[in-house]
Swiss-Prot record:
Active-site residues (renumbered): 423
EC numbers, comma separated: 7.2.2.12
Keywords of this entry: ATP-binding, Cell membrane, Ion transport, Magnesium, Membrane, Metal-binding, Nucleotide-binding, Translocase, Transmembrane, Transmembrane helix, Transport, Virulence, Zinc, Zinc transport
Protein name as it appears in the record: Zinc-exporting P-type ATPase
Source species of the chain: Mycobacterium marinum (strain ATCC BAA-535 / M)
Amino acid sequence: MTLAIVKEVPAGADGDDTTDLVVLSDAAGRMRVRADWVRGNSRRAVAVEEAVAKQDGVRVVHAYPRTGSVVVWYSPRRCDRAAVLEAIGGAKHVAAELIPARAPHSTEIRNTDVLRMVIGGAALALLGVRRYVFARPPLLGPSGRMVATGVTIFTGYPFLRGALRSLRSGKAGTDALVSAATIASLILRENVVALTVLWLLNIGEYLQDLTLRRTRRAISELLRGNQDTAWIRLTDGPEAGTEVQVPIDSVQIGDEVVVHDHVAIPVDGEVVDGEAIVNQSAITGENLPVSVVAGATVHAGSVVVRGRLVVRAQAVGNQTTIGRIITRVEEAQNDRAPIQTVGENFSRRFVPTSFIVSAITLLVTGDVRRAMTMLLIACPCAVGLSTPTAISAAIGNGARRGILIKGGSHLEQAGRVDAIVFDKTGTLTVGRPVVTNIIAMHKDWEPEQVLAYAASSEIHSRHPLAEAVIRSTEERRISIPPHEECEVLVGLGMRTWADGRTLLLGSPSLLESEQVKVSKKASEWVGKLRQQAETPLLLAVDGTLVGLISLRDEVRPEAAEVLTKLRDNGVRRIVMLTGDHPDIAKVVAEELGIDEWRAEVMPEDKLEVVRDLQDEGYVVGMVGDGINDAPALAAADIGIAMGLAGTDVAVETADVALANDDLHRLLDVRDLGGRAVDVIRQNYGMSIAVNAAGLLIGAGGALSPVLAAILHNASSVAVVANSSRLIRYRLE
């Protein structure tokens, strides 16, 4: 057999996309390629895996964002090596929206970790047999020491590598403590002790990693479930109507996806055929199934409990609602909570102190084993795990409830909020108003015309009032005249050009600002309607008032209860803001028991209210759902967007997004944030106590290096186990 090892060879030199690839090795059907642009970029790693997997003869491909390398297993006879390199290079330019929302395959592959544990365990077993079965002396001979040293270096490689990296950066980390103890034991010919310690530490690291991956796996299952394929119904050609099975990642927008009993819906889209009972808990957090018929919108991750649906795909992969959740969760797990700096400061100061204490112990006692023990027990690994494990578990818990938390810092703030600012429409109210009155204010206009032209102004708006007007025309089967152009006047209304006319639709303030006269009769109607908590919209055509439409939005049934519980849980200030008239705002505020409210506010006014509360020393939460809430959502200590499928600007700006519109989720956000901080504090207390106690006991000579390693592992595993309780915290 001939093996060809190619070192540091550029993969291409003709100006193509392979010029920045380096083939590190290529032998016996296994090729390793370095692609620096993959390093630290999990999404791009997925793109590489997807592109290479499509090439003929490729068996398995793993892209490693931690190292920037790509490993391809292929059939030498069937696979074109150049095509594989081309596919890797081409993946660099794949649009982000076309990359499936999943983790790289490499995140689940930890063969080397398992191999280290197996080899280390086997070596220890053989040494035990040698010592106790064959009654050989405990000290190893030259050949035995050489083998034991080799195995020790192999099992301790991750720690040695980490120590070198930390020393290059001028910081002595926890890996440096383990490495120093290992090197000392090898110099003193304590090979068995070193191997035992490293084997135990490797087991602990593997168990920690296994526990931490539960969150990512739980979130990924929301999108893919247990299925890798989907059924689609062909719509073109002679086989139209035939159902065929395809890989789930190949489903495209516009495909008609067929979903049967007990199968997760793989796309966001509109139901075009069939009816079913659907469990939407993955998206909304609600366990009660709902009935779905043709015309309804469904989301990926929802499960058909009973029935059959044909769904026309409107979003696939990471562009679906659940895909956005997964993307945000993965980004959020890199966000650092302020409390994390406590552990980092402790570790940064504690590691050098541990070296000093160990050196003093060696000088005073002359016992190298005791000094080694001090280094091992002083490793603040558990302290370093305290915050990220808890944050990761809590974010995963929230995602499974339909609460998208975009980072650890926001989670910590959620538990400290003591002032909340609410936007009224769509937040405290249902946000689905209905048209209650249509009044013509001009002799040449009929109510139906007023409604039709109002709908023309609102036809492309996603504002709840606009949607109510459109629904009303559809219910009355009134045709809507097309418009040529429209302009959104934020907080006031719309200006539209249709049929050669200029239309203004909005509040009386809009008409006054545009010099349109509002009659006494219209003003009386406006006042009367506002006292009934109805919102009047005035329609002016070419500078003349022609009609009035009023709409009413009901208060959410759970709003009063949630506000009461927020006050009971320590929220001292609750403020309601609305662009509506003061009369309407007053009626809603009185119904909900809100003392502080402001009406007719613009986006900058909402921002001002948030900043004023912050200046008074409050930790401010802002809850909203519209474009006009975005500045305040961004400025608040924690911004919460209602409805993940709502306004994209609000969802992108907010720190937390709720997948459904149930205000009870606000209580869950605060509860989860507070619980996460409690768990982090427990972790810190437990891990720091173990470090301190271990140092005292170790200095007295009561601990061996092996016992120190066991205690070190026990504290780390205890921290991870304590944090993992958050994964299932109050999740029913």
